[in-house]
């Protein structure tokens, strides 16, 4: 199992920090509850509205999954306009 992420160092700006625990994610299907498949899973959250690198990350993910999850690929392209240049 991976080491837990450190907490935010409030003496540093976000630009001066690497990975740290910023969010507590709970799945809506209940599978993040104790004993379930996704209990204690680590998630990487992207702020689609404010992160200048979000579109590039979304595009890379959509392209990576398009053969195995074609509907997810199409949904991401349509919702986030990923057919447009980054």
Describe each model-derived feature in a short phrase.
Residues 1-65, 70-86:
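Polar/charged low-complexity regulatory segments
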